[in-house]
From Swiss-Prot:
It catalyses: Random endo-hydrolysis of N-acetyl-beta-D-glucosaminide (1->4)-beta-linkages in chitin and chitodextrins. Residues 1-30 form the signal peptide. This is Chitinase D. It comes from Niallia circulans. It comes from the Bacteria. Belongs to the glycosyl hydrolase 18 family. Chitinase class II subfamily. One of its GO terms (molecular function) is endochitinase activity.
Amino acid sequence: MNQAVRFRPVITFALAFILIITWFAPRADAAAQWQAGTAYKQGDLVTYLNKDYECIQPHTALTGWEPSNVPALWKYVGEGTGGGTPTPDTTPPTVPAGLTSSLVTDTSVNLTWNASTDNVGVTGYEVYRNGTLVANTSTTTAVVTGLTAGTTYVFTVKAKDAAGNLSAASTSLSVTTSTGSSNPGPSGSKWLIGYWHNFDNGSTNIKLRNVSTAYDVINVSFAEPISPGSGTLAFTPYNATVEEFKSDIAYLQSQGKKVLISMGGANGRIELTDATKKRQQFEDSLKSIISTYGFNGLDIDLEGSSLSLNAGDTDFRSPTTPKIVNLINGVKALKSHFGANFVLTAAPETAYVQGGYLNYGGPWGAYLPVIHALRNDLTLLHVQHYNTGSMVGLDGRSYAQGTADFHVAMAQMLLQGFNVGGSSGPFFSPLRPDQIAIGVPASQQAAGGGYTAPAELQKALNYLIKGVSYGGSYTLRQPAGYVGLKGIMTWSINWDAYTNNQFSNAHRPFLNGLSTQKTEEVVY
């Protein structure tokens, strides 16, 4: 018998068996389920809620960073969990609703709308002005700048998903810009803000009137409680009589400077735990201090346990922690008492502001209810970009203090806004650019960490204000920048003098150069 004929059935059966095994065998490259705590690299495939995603940026997954929630980290690639050809997504998101405006100035407007929904996930929104695309954002708010005073504009918003599907335009909104701004402050368009020590810590002992003329705003540090737990604050000049100090303040004011009393500091624990006695002590004592010396306003520099959220206080829009509620009401009373020209600033640490992006509770985000409630009263917010370590930006990446990327990422969180306590949390709306300055140490000796060389800081400011990229890791969500961003705060004037004013000598000319550009001018 012919051997070829003899063994053909066996070969045919074996081949059929192999084909069957091949056909039903699971794919080796099937996407694994997404899991928090797993380190993912670029190109990794995962499945989440029966949808496949590809990692586009290396990271370690955290709860709240699910692929559908973080388009900066994951790209949707199709339906199904077991491989095969993905089903194309052709369904557009729903139309954005509830488009409203707020914080309208002569050159800018803040727009807010309700979130759209999508069968896979909304990745962003396009903002149109008079039919022209002017901004892209991944949040439900946008600050449109570069507008003309006294002009009416028509805005619409469209939602988009990862597949590029675009919703229909929202209902149009007409906004008319104002004819000018009334936010009080120095007449210069870019400010240098410094803290002056009312104590001797080995840096430099300076008479208040001898502060470098490079500074626009001088925060006298500090008014502190007269005893632990008291709501009464006190201030006594340490190197001058009361009359001499009043004369020094008047002298600086004659030069166009603003001189504020700063309350708190690292050692000044202020906790207004009751709405009657302590809050009244707080208001009365600050009214007396401000009136006695002729200060232009108040700087809030509360640290440590002075601001901390109680358990169960979960929404910055309606805080329940007594010492936070009482602080808000007390400051509002001071603003009302002294009137529209009262200058109000704040210098929180990053944990108390940007730290609320991922976690909201205890100290994390504890300043947010204060900033939110006072946003229409606040002249300037200069978060301390030092003594903080690394912080996470809007792109989900961690940035180290003392770098241009850190300054850009932290500033943009306030310029763009962010969800508090995770991607599903309530949205903290952005402040105006002219309400934002960057806080840095004046020298290596001034802080435990975060000192930034002048060239590095100016690199960050050129990107933030003019949109001039330095090729860093963080990418601005508004490529043109924020021309109205106000300037630089430093701790401190005394530490600057310790190094022969190297800090102010480097940054004053730089800020003057920025001031020649068109900005959202603040007139006092």
